[in-house]
Amino acid sequence: MPTIQQLIRTEREKARQKTKSPALKQCPQRRGVCTRVYTTTPKKPNSALRKVARVRLTSGFEVTAYIPGIGHNLQEHSVVMIRGGRVKDLPGVRYHIIRGTLDTAGVKDRKQGRSKYGTKRPKEAKK
């Protein structure tokens, strides 16, 4: 416990909050280039083949980002936009690729939650 005199001399240091997405450098999104697109398996007790990509960002970081939705058109050298947001059952995956921007196509035949997957509104069927 410091004395009052010690506190006058040097005030207490504020506890700094550590960011959960350092590669974004305080920006909401970042652009990057895919260096590798592959599938990986989640932690126990889940089982699947999750689609992920290794992305080199304009901020200089190389991160692993999750590709949401069913099916994708990404390959090496695709230019993508990433946002923060981890995938709970994939250790080390702290970013999501934004569908429907740059080289990433939206999810085909998506009817609900379209804005999250970059899908345009479907044309109404003519009667």
From Swiss-Prot:
- Molecular-function annotations in GO: rRNA binding; structural constituent of ribosome; tRNA binding
A single GO BP annotation from the record? Answer: translation
Instruction: Give residue numbers for the modification (3-methylthioaspartic acid).
Output: 89
Q: Which Gene3D superfamilies match?
A: Nucleic acid-binding proteins
Against InterPro entries, the record matches this protein to:
NA-bd_OB-fold, Ribosomal_uS12, Ribosomal_uS12_bac
Q: Name one Pfam family in it.
A: Ribosom_S12_S23
Q: Which UniProt keywords apply?
A: Methylation, Ribonucleoprotein, Ribosomal protein, RNA-binding, rRNA-binding, tRNA-binding
CDD domains registered for this protein in UniProt: Ribosomal_S12 (cd03368)
**Compositionally biased spans, kind Basic residues:** 113-127
Q: Where is this region: Disordered?
A: 8-28, 102-127
Q: What are its GO cellular component terms?
A: small ribosomal subunit
Matching PANTHER family: 30S RIBOSOMAL PROTEIN S12 FAMILY MEMBER (PTHR11652)
Role summary: With S4 and S5 plays an important role in translational accuracy. Interacts with and stabilizes bases of the 16S rRNA that are involved in tRNA selection in the A site and with the mRNA backbone. Located at the interface of the 30S and 50S subunits, it traverses the body of the 30S subunit contacting proteins on the other side and probably holding the rRNA structure together. The combined cluster of proteins S8, S12 and S17 appears to hold together the shoulder and platform of the 30S subunit.
What is known about its subunit structure? Part of the 30S ribosomal subunit. Contacts proteins S8 and S17. May interact with IF1 in the 30S initiation complex.
- Entry's family note: Belongs to the universal ribosomal protein uS12 family.
- Kindly provide the name given to this protein in its UniProt entry: Small ribosomal subunit protein uS12
Q: Which organism's genome codes for this protein?
A: Nostoc sp. (strain PCC 7120 / SAG 25.82 / UTEX 2576)
Instruction: Write the gene name.
Output: rpsL
